[in-house]
């Protein structure tokens, strides 16, 4: 099953902060890079800069690390 922009996916990379969480595909890079799928999440991760709110709401994954839902 091919993943496309706008699809909802479950993260299968065990070392990821978002493991087994769901997100929406924001973009897919066709240039041949390893982690070509950018996924956007509803909540931020724990990587905030000292003294500021928030963290990352997107992360890049390889297609094999994602499960389309």
Swiss-Prot record:
<dbReference type="GO" id="GO:0031676">
    <property type="term" value="C:plasma membrane-derived thylakoid membrane"/>
</dbReference>
<keyword id="KW-0603">Photosystem I</keyword>
<keyword id="KW-0793">Thylakoid</keyword>
<dbReference type="InterPro" id="IPR003375">
    <property type="entry name" value="PSI_PsaE"/>
</dbReference>
<dbReference type="InterPro" id="IPR008990">
    <property type="entry name" value="Elect_transpt_acc-like_dom_sf"/>
</dbReference>
<protein>
    <recommendedName>
        <fullName>Photosystem I reaction center subunit IV</fullName>
    </recommendedName>
</protein>
<keyword id="KW-0472">Membrane</keyword>
<dbReference type="GO" id="GO:0015979">
    <property type="term" value="P:photosynthesis"/>
</dbReference>
<comment type="similarity">
    <text>Belongs to the PsaE family.</text>
</comment>
<dbReference type="Pfam" id="PF02427">
    <property type="entry name" value="PSI_PsaE"/>
</dbReference>
<keyword id="KW-0602">Photosynthesis</keyword>
<comment type="function">
    <text>Stabilizes the interaction between PsaC and the PSI core, assists the docking of the ferredoxin to PSI and interacts with ferredoxin-NADP oxidoreductase.</text>
</comment>
<dbReference type="GO" id="GO:0009538">
    <property type="term" value="C:photosystem I reaction center"/>
</dbReference>
